[in-house]
Every structure is written in C-alpha cells, then in structure tokens.
Curated annotation (Swiss-Prot):
<keyword id="KW-0274">FAD</keyword>
<feature type="glycosylation site" description="N-linked (GlcNAc...) asparagine">
    <location>
        <position position="417"/>
    </location>
</feature>
<dbReference type="GO" id="GO:0005773">
    <property type="term" value="C:vacuole"/>
</dbReference>
<comment type="similarity">
    <text>Belongs to the oxygen-dependent FAD-linked oxidoreductase family.</text>
</comment>
<keyword id="KW-0325">Glycoprotein</keyword>
<feature type="glycosylation site" description="N-linked (GlcNAc...) asparagine">
    <location>
        <position position="133"/>
    </location>
</feature>
<keyword id="KW-0285">Flavoprotein</keyword>
<dbReference type="InterPro" id="IPR016166">
    <property type="entry name" value="FAD-bd_PCMH"/>
</dbReference>
<feature type="glycosylation site" description="N-linked (GlcNAc...) asparagine">
    <location>
        <position position="70"/>
    </location>
</feature>
<dbReference type="InterPro" id="IPR006094">
    <property type="entry name" value="Oxid_FAD_bind_N"/>
</dbReference>
<dbReference type="InterPro" id="IPR016169">
    <property type="entry name" value="FAD-bd_PCMH_sub2"/>
</dbReference>
<feature type="disulfide bond">
    <location>
        <begin position="32"/>
        <end position="95"/>
    </location>
</feature>
<feature type="domain" description="FAD-binding PCMH-type">
    <location>
        <begin position="73"/>
        <end position="249"/>
    </location>
</feature>
<dbReference type="InterPro" id="IPR036318">
    <property type="entry name" value="FAD-bd_PCMH-like_sf"/>
</dbReference>
<dbReference type="GO" id="GO:0009506">
    <property type="term" value="C:plasmodesma"/>
</dbReference>
<dbReference type="InterPro" id="IPR016167">
    <property type="entry name" value="FAD-bd_PCMH_sub1"/>
</dbReference>
<dbReference type="GO" id="GO:0016491">
    <property type="term" value="F:oxidoreductase activity"/>
</dbReference>
Length: 533
C-alpha cells in the first residue's frame, strides 16, 4: 500500500505540474536528443512525444494491461520516447541521465503493478513497441532466432511457425506479453518441465548501458549476461534484443482439460496432483486452477486442470491411468493437434481448426481488467486437511483464485545460481489471482483484501526465510524502494524474496555496471552503499 499511497500523492503533483515545467523538460530533452542523434524534426515528432502530442495518450494507454493504472488520477510521464532505431535508445538514455530524469522501460506492458509506466517522481517512458523485428534461422545449430525486446511472444511463435511446424520456443502462453520483460525476468510456459526456463535458451543479447553504449554478450562480459537472465533487464540497461535457441517438438501434441467439483472428488485430485505433476514425464505439464464460485453462485471451489503433453493422446491416457487415476482422464477428454494450435487452445479457443495462427500477431487485448497478482513457491505437499481448509476459505472469497504450476523435470538438473533466477528446485509455483470489473477504491480494497487473505492462509505451506516470489509476477506488497540513503536495505527486503542468494551477485553486477543507479524503479536491484564498495 506504501507505493499506492505515493502514486496517489504523486498524482496530485503530476496534475499540478505547471505547463511551463512540462515544456521546459520537453525542450531540454529535445535539445539534448537532437545533439546526440541526427534525427529530423519530422521524425522527432513521432519519436519524442510530449503530453501535448495527439499521440501521447493513445501510446501510453496502448500497453497498459492493468486497468488500475489506466485512470486519470494516475501519474503520467512527462515524455514518451518511442524509438525506431538503436541510436534513439542510446540518446534516450544519455539525455535522461544528463537531465536527471527517471527512465521507465516498457516492452509489452504486462508489469502487474505498473512499474514500467507509473512512478511517484517525474519520469519518462521508453516504449519499445517498435522494436519487434524477429529473424529465425533454422540452419543455426538446431535453430535460433534474434528477437527484439518489443516483440510479443505471440509474434515470436508465429515467425517460428512460418518456418517450421516442429520448432518451438519455451516461453509463456499469453501471446501479448512482451519479450523484454518476460525473458529478462526468467520466463516460463507449458514446456517448462521439458525444456526449462525461457532464459535457459538465451545465448546472446544486445544492451544499452548507463553510458549509452551498446554491448553484445562478448563486450558486456559474463556477469552482466548472467544478470539479465532472470534478474530483470531494467535494473542494468535497456536490452534491445535476445538471441535464443529453438527447441524441437513432435508434429502431434496432446492437450486436455478436466474440471471437477468438490462432490466429484476435486480435493483428492488436487492432493494427488502434488505428487504426480512435478515427477511425471517431463513432456507433460498439468496446470491446476482453483477459483472461488463467482460465476456459478455455488458454495464450492471451481477446480480445473489444463495440460499439454508432447506426444500422442493414447500414451498420456495410459500414463495417467497408471500414475494419476484420481484424474479420471479419458481419451475423449484429449485433443491432438500441432504445437502452434496448442497455443491457440491455451488462449481458450476450443475449436482450434477454426482459428488461424495470425491471431498470435494481435498485440492488444480486447480490454484491460482490474487485477492484482502475488506468487509463492511450494516445497512440500499440503495434506488433505490443509487443502480442505484452503478450499473452504476460497469458496467465501469473491473472484479470487490460485494457479498451480508444476516444476520438476529439467528444472531439477540446473543449479540455482546458473542464472539469476533461483527458484528451480521446487514442487510447484502458485500465482495468487484476483480480477474484477469495476473501478473505484472500494472495489479495489475488497478484492485485493480477498487476495491477501488467501496469501496469508498459505503462509504455513510455502517457502520460508525468505518467502520467495517470482519477479515476473510483480508484487509491490513485498517491498518498495525510493533509492535514498537506505536504498540497499530496502532493496534487500524484496530482493531476497525474488532472487534468494543470487541477490548478492546481482547487487555486485549492478554496482559495477551502473554505479550511479540510473536504471531504477521501485523494485530494481540497488547498488552497494558507498562504505561497502
């Protein structure tokens, strides 16, 4: 709540910011930008957008995915920079640093708590939506792609599919998520157990540092390359592009869904799922969704299982009969399809034969919703009585849910310090979720209160010392930082939860590559205090 208070406080400041002040910031920035680049005045008007620009509001709102931050009271950037080429990004960094202005970096806008486009201080937004070039090369080893960080996952999947139906990339199932944030925060999807995290397939990158210089993997050196794979790129620079290795998948994969009520032994299914899902064939990913009975107005929890199997339906039905009879999987529950179609199915398109893959190219969702998310990691199976208490409480909390994502498989064979992402050797991850339709502080207090209730209920059953969180499920409840004199101490509070023991190395890298802490946000990696450098 501390950051929300700051944001509303800042909103009054933002709205009272005199037009003279706003004009001065714009004029100073433009003069610097023109000095650093060779941009024409015509191009400049499309790249550097002041609040008075007709393109300012549509550009800002286009990639705000959480409606909580798409209101008139939220603080707005003084300028939005929409770069077209690398030199525009370099100029944005140089000029923002010269003028001591905070620079927010936005690729897809899916930061759950809005830190890529909202701040309590005067700030600029660097919108990378034009950086969406993707080059797929199937002749490079087993296949690779260079993808700019403003591209979406859907665009990446589509460009791979254009070249091959048996090549894929292991990342998220939401097609409008931006590559930049997803990859730099770790990244995962429905092939995580087979192929590991998204960052495990990153082999090169280009980044603009705090001095406006561009580096690839060789010139940035391995410490920085390590940090931007799971540590969040926005703490260290502006990542322009990633080179990723592709994976091969069968021509035919299988998806299935099983829904159960409490009367249909949903509790038994979820209990057994904890033992099977993290230990079964790595080619099988089974996600469980638990939700309060908002829609059907019953008094029981809705329990849904959604799955992808990298193989044929007959094989997974036989496997589940042996390992997971509580699921009750039947052949008629399964659908065989191509990998690209499985992504459409995961988008809730039931009849994938009637949906064209081009839908993956759509960048904007139908509408942004009001939402809040939190995360947890589970290291030991919950007992049936413990699950039963969760079910009973969840049934009373409107619009609240939990998404359980199994780990195991490839995640267990990689060291926790191989990349900056530390949460590998877990049973499963929980996403705590609440989404609501209505604006206003009363609705926000009610529904976020419900979410925090489920989060508190889970306290005894999840990781401890610290209670771990997933960076890409941004959660300002676990701590925020104004980067003052005690910035390191504040950063350590949320930093240990996101990064565990890897936090120490991340701080050392940050201090080395950005000693002035130019690249910062309310949950960025802090620098070491002067007396510890």
């Amino acid at each position: 709540m501390y950051l929300i208070f700051l944001l509303f406080f800042a909103a009054s400041y933002s709205m009272s910011l005199s037009s003279a002040d706003s004009v001065t910031i714009y004029e100073d920035f433009v003069q610097c930008f023109k000095n650093v680049t060779t941009i024409s005045d015509i191009d400049l008007s499309d790249v550097v957008l002041p609040r008075t620009s007709i393109s300012f509001t549509p550009t800002l709102r286009a990639y705000i995915r959480n409606a909580r931050f798409n209101t008139s009271s939220m603080p707005k950037p003084s300028i939005i920079i929409v770069p077209r080429v690398d030199s525009h990004v370099q100029a944005a960094v140089i000029c923002a640093k010269t003028l001591n202005l905070q620079l927010k970096i936005r690729s897809g806008g899916h930061d759950y708590d809005g830190l890529s486009y909202v701040s309590a201080v005067t700030f600029l937004v660097l919108d990378l939506s034009n950086f969406r070039n993707i080059t797929v090369d199937l002749n490079d080893g087993g296949g690779s792609a260079w993808v700019q960080t403003g591209a979406t996952l859907g665009e990446l999947y589509y460009r791979i599919w254009e070249k091959s139906e048996v090549h894929a990339f292991p990342a998220g199932v939401c097609p409008t998520v931006g590559v930049g944030g997803h990859v730099s925060g770790g990244g995962y999807g429905h092939m995580i157990r087979k192929f590991g995290l998204t960052i495990d397939h990153v082999v090169d990158a280009t980044i603009v540092d705090a001095n406006g210089q561009i580096h690839d993997r060789k010139s940035m050196e391995e410490d920085l390359f390590w940090a931007i794979r799971g540590g969040g790129g926005g703490s260290f620079g502006v990542v322009l592009a990633f080179k990723v290795k592709l994976v091969t998948v069968p021509k035919t994969v299988t998806v299935f869904r099983v829904d159960k009520s409490v009367d249909e032994n949903a509790l038994d299914m979820v209990y057994k799922w904890q033992f099977v899902a993290p230990r079964t064939d790595p080619g099988l990913f089974m996600r469980v969704l638990l939700s309060s009975p908002t829609q059907n107005k019953t008094s029981t929890v809705n329990t849904k299982l959604r799955a992808l199997y990298l193989g044929k339906a007959d094989d997974v039905v036989l496997k589940m009969a042996e390992e997971f009879p509580e699921l009750g999987l039947k052949k008629e529950d399964c659908k065989e399809m191509t990998w690209i179609q499985s992504l459409l199915w995961w988008m809730n398109h039931v009849d994938v034969d009637k949906v064209k893959p081009e839908i993956l190219l759509e960048r904007e969702p139908d509408s942004a919703k009001f939402l809040k998310r939190k995360s947890d990691y589970v290291e030991k199976e919950m007992t049936k009585p413990e699950l039963n208490r969760l079910f009973q409480k969840l049934a009373t909390l409107d619009r609240t849910g939990l998404v359980l994502n199994p780990y195991g498989g490839s995640l267990n064979v990689t060291a926790v310090n191989a990349t900056a992402f530390p949460h590998r050797h877990k049973l499963y991850k929980i996403q705590h979720s609440v989404t609501w339709p209505d604006a206003g502080p009363e609705a926000e207090r009610l529904y976020i209160g419900n979410l925090r209730t489920t989060y508190n209920i889970m306290t005894p059953f999840v990781s401890k010392n610290p209670r771990s969180s997933y960076l890409n499920y941004r959660d300002i409840d676990i701590g925020v930082n104004d980067h003052g004199a005690d910035g390191y101490r504040k950063g350590e509070i949320y930093g240990r939860k996101y990064f565990g023991e890897n936090f120490d190395r991340l701080v050392r890298v940050k201090t080395a590559v950005d000693p002035d802490n130019f690249f910062r946000n309310e949950q960025s990696i802090p620098t070491l205090p002067p007396n510890r450098r």
